[in-house]
Amino acid sequence: MSTQEERQINTEYAVSLLEQLKLFYEQQLFTDIVLIVEGTEFPCHKMVLATCSSYFRAMFMSGLSESKQTHVHLRNVDAAALQMIIAYAYTGNLAVNDSTVEQLYETACFLQVEDVLQRCREYLIKKINAENCVRLLSFADLFSCEELKQSAKRMVEHKFTAVYRQEAFMQLSHDLLIDILSSDNLNVEKEETVREAAMLWLEYNTESRSQYLSSVLSQIRIDALSEVTQRAWFQGLPPNDKSVVVQGLYKSMPKFFKPRLGMTKEEMMIFIEASSENPCSLYSSVCYSPQAEKVYKLCSPPADLHKVGTVVTPDNDIYIAGGQVPLKNTKTNHSKTSKLQTAFRTVNCFYWFDAQQNTWFPKTPMLFVRVKPSLVCCEGYIYAIGGDSVGGELNRRTVERYDTEKDEWTMVSPLPCAWQWSAAVVVHDCIYVMTLNLMYCYFPRSDSWVEMAMRQTSRSFASAAAFGDKIFYIGGLHIATNSGIRLPSGTVDGSSVTVEIYDVNKNEWKMAANIPAKRYSDPCVRAVVISNSLCVFMRETHLNERAKYVTYQYDLELDRWSLRQHISERVLWDLGRDFRCTVGKLYPSCLEESPWKPPTYLFSPDGTEEFELDGEMVALPPV
C-alpha cells in the first residue's frame, strides 16, 4: 500500500464557507468592525474586508489607532458603492451597470479593491463609444487607469470629427488636448478640422486659456491647410496674437509633412470568409484597394467564425454578427479536395472592427443565434434581420436592433414571412428586405412592415444595393416555376447576368440592361457602391477553373454596364464561393500587404516550370 499522502480539494467546502460568512454578515453575527459612511453603518468582519481590500488590510495591520477601533468613519466614499463592494467581498457577485460603474470604480480605487477595479475597467472599455469616449478619457486620466485611457483615446481619435464639438471636449485638460491634437492617428480627412477643434477649445474660456495659445496651435500642421484657410486665419487674428500664432506654428514645422491617419485611408472592397491558404484555418479576410490595385491582409474573425452578416455604417464602422464556429475537439480536415469533417455551433456573436488596431472587438451579443443574417444601418441603429437559425421558422422571422450608444439589443416587429435567405438595403431611412420575388419595407418610426411591389423574376442568392432612390437586385439563381430547379439568372451559360431596378418613389420594378459577362461566369455577384458608383464584383471563370475577377460599373442614364477594372491574378486569388463583400475605408499603414505567390494548384505534375498568367508566361520559383 502506497504511503504517499493523498490530497483532494473540496470545492464545495469553499462555497459553503463563503455562504456561511455571508449569513453571518446578514445576521450581524461575530462582526468586529463597523464602517460609517454618510451616517449609514455597515457592520462587517475585519478578516473579510482585509482579504479583498489592500486599504483595509493596511489599516487593520498597521498598529495605528484605526486597527483597534470598532467604528471607522470613511470620508469621500459613496455609501451605495461601498455597499456593493461589501456584498462582493462576501459573495463574489458584482452587478455593474451604466449608472453605478463610475462611482463604483472611484470607491474601489480609494479602497484598493483590485478585483472590482478590473471588472469596472472591462465594463467601461466595452461601453466606450462616440458619446462617452471624451468623458471616459478624462475619467481614466484622473484615476491613472492606463488601459481605459488608451482605449478611450483610440475612440476619440477614430471619432474625432464627431466629438470635437462636445461639451466634454471643451472641458479637456490642456495636457489631454495636446496629447490628442498631436496624434498622428486622428481620423480626419482635412487638417482644417484639427484647427477648428483647437480654436473652439481656446475660445471656450479665452481668459484662462490664452496662456496655452502657442502650445495648442503648434499641434496644427499648417502645411496640410489649404492656402485659402491659412490666409483667412491669419487675417482674422488680433494683432497681439499673430506673433504668438507664428511662434506656435513654427514649433510644428518638423511635423509639416506627416499626414494624419485619416488622410491616408482608402476605399477598399472587404472580403470576409474568403478561402484560406493557411492549413490551420478554414477562412481568411482580405481587402482590395482598386486605386492601388493591392491586396491587404485583414484580421480574420475570432475562432474561425463564418457565415456571418456584415455591415459598414455611414460613419465607416464595420460590424459582423452571428455565424458558426467549429466545435472544440472535433476532427477537422482543411484539404480542399477532401470532405470537411468539422461540427459547428451557431452563435449570436457581435463584433466591431478596430481599423487602427486591425482587430475585432467583441460587443454585446445578439438576443438570437443567427446564420447569415442581413445587417443594415438605419437612423443610427444596426438591424439584424432573419437568417437561418436553430429555432426554425419563428426565429427566421425575428428582427432585432442594436443601439451603438447603449451597446444593447432590443426586439422589433418580426418579418411577415420566414426566409432562409434574404438581402436588405436602406433607402430614405426605410429598410427594404428582398427574397425570391417578394419585397417588404420596414418603417422604423412606426415599427411596421408593408409588402411592396413584386419583382418580375424569382431569384435567390442575388445581391442588392441601394443607389440614390433606386434599389438594384442583381444576379443570383433563377427558380424554375415547375421544377424548382435553380438556374443562373440571365443566360444558362452565364454569359449575362440579370438586373432589376426598383424605384422607391413609384413602387415599381423594371428590367435593366444585363451585365455582359463572359461564359460560365458566377451568377452570384456582389453589388457594391464604390467611389460613388454602382459596381458589381464578379468571377468570370467557372468555379472549377482558375479564378479571374472583374468589376463592372453601371451608367444609370445610358442603362449600360461597362468593364471598370480587370483584377490581375497576381493580386487576387481564389476567394471561394461563400465570401462576404462590402466596402469601407481602411488605413493601408495599419494593414499588412499580402505578398504575391503562385497557388499550389498551378504547379503542373508533368514538371512544367512556367504557366500563363494575365496573358504572360510566368516562371515558377525554384524549390
UniProtKB/Swiss-Prot annotation:
The keyword Phosphoprotein applies. The modification Phosphoserine is found at S300. Keywords: Kelch repeat, Phosphoprotein, Repeat, Ubl conjugation pathway. Residues 31-98 form the BTB domain. Induction: In adipose tissue, expression is inhibited by diet-induced obesity, the inhibition is mediated by leptin. Residues 133-229 form the BACK domain. Gene3D superfamilies: 1.25.40.420, Kelch-type beta propeller (2.120.10.80), Potassium Channel Kv1.1, Chain A (3.30.710.10). Disruption phenotype: Mutants exhibit growth retardation, hyperglycemia, insulin resistance, lipodystrophy and hepatosteatosis. Double knockouts for KBTBD2 and PIK3R1 have increased body weight, restored fat storage and decreased blood glucose and insulin. Adipocyte-specific knockouts accumulate PIK3R1 in white and brown adipose tissues, causing insulin resistance, moderate rather than severe hyperglycemia, sustained hyperinsulinemia without late failure of insulin production and lipodystrophy leading to ectopic lipid accumulation in the liver. Kelch repeats lie at residues 317-380, 381-429, 431-469, 470-529, 535-581. Coiled coil: none annotated. Expressed at high levels in muscle, liver, brain, heart as well as white and brown adipose tissues. Pathway: Protein modification; protein ubiquitination. Substrate-specific adapter of a BCR (BTB-CUL3-RBX1) E3 ubiquitin ligase complex that acts as a regulator of the insulin signaling pathway, modulating insulin sensitivity by limiting PIK3R1/p85alpha abundance in adipocytes. Targets PIK3R1, the regulatory subunit of phosphatidylinositol 3-kinase (PI3K), for 'Lys-48'-linked polyubiquitination and proteasome-mediated degradation. Recognizes the BCR (BTB-CUL3-RBX1) E3 ubiquitin ligase complex substrate, PIK3R1, through the 4 tandem C-terminal Kelch domains. Component of the BCR(KBTBD2) E3 ubiquitin ligase complex, at least composed of CUL3, KBTBD2 and RBX1. Interacts (via the BTB domain) with CUL3. This is Kelch repeat and BTB domain-containing protein 2. It comes from Mus musculus. The gene is Kbtbd2.
